Amino acid sequence: DNIPWFISENGMGVEGEERFINSEGYIEDDYRIEFFEEHLSYLHKAIKEGANCFGYHSWTPIDCWSWTNAYKNRYGFIAVDLKTQKKTMKKSGKWIKEVSKNNGF
């Protein structure tokens, strides 16, 4: 049987992401883009080969608190300044927006 399934949580946490802030004030997280691009490419291949996957969810769209390391690692497509609560789209957020808009790479 080809059981329907979905990926409920996929993502990566990075410590010290503020070191990747560029002169325009947003985080250039190419490592996260590469991570998601690779995972989505393999998922696409699996679907083409008959996998019955009907959904894919990233871990979180916004930097969040983790039971394991609080706010030490950052996970989202949107950065959160913990002092001001200002939210800033990361490079990966701009990338995933385009992937979603175009329904693929």
Label each region the model flagged:
Residues 1-105:
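Non-catalytic scaffold segments within catalytic domains of secreted glycoside hydrolases
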